[in-house]
């Protein structure tokens, strides 16, 4: 566990039963956590970061992740969390049950325009599994690989942790 992650977990414990919130910022000195005050009218169910806290974090370096917690909740982003994450275009780190779950920002699964290697079939199910907390590696693939008799999805299943049952 990194020092940043330790600071995040300590902040989350201090905030219970309210949701904690803050930012992971990359500074010239390295990565650090900037805790924020949850100004939500219902802090035990939602979080809201004051614009001043957002600006304070941006002034310290590049914001690389927004962090919040689900005390007593589930270890994945809610529907509202996902909408806000997409608007923020940031990775979101979620603290739940003493663990940090890291969610990279992925676009909505429906309505995507097909682009090989960017928003293709593998990217779609890789993103869907990611939203469920399962990370799958990306792999290099040339366009039209399926026309040469290859099946990169099945060939790479073992690498992603899947196995035949």
Specify the residue positions occupied by each region the protein language model found.
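Histidine/lysine/aspartate-rich catalytic loop segments that bind and position anionic ligands
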Residues: 127-133, 141-146
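...with weaker cross-activation on analogous glycine-rich loops/strands in unrelated enzymes
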Residues: 142-165
């Amino acid at each position: 566990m990194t020092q940043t992650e330790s600071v995040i977990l300590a902040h989350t414990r201090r905030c219970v039963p309210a949701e904690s919130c803050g930012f992971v910022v990359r500074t010239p000195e390295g990565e650090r956590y900037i805790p924020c005050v949850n100004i939500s009218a219902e802090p035990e169910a939602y979080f809201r970061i004051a614009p001043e806290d957002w600006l304070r974090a941006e002034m310290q370096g590049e914001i690389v992740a927004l962090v919040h917690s689900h005390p007593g909740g589930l270890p994945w982003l809610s529907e509202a969390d996902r909408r806000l994450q997409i608007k923020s275009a940031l990775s979101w780190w979620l603290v739940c049950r003493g663990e940090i779950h890291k969610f990279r920002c992925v676009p909505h699964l429906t309505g995507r325009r097909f682009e090989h290697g960017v928003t293709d079939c593998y990217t779609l199910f890789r993103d869907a599994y990611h939203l469920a907390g399962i990370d799958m590696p990306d792999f290099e693939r040339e366009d039209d690989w399926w026309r040469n008799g290859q099946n990169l999805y099945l060939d790479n299943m073992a690498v992603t942790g899947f196995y035949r049952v």
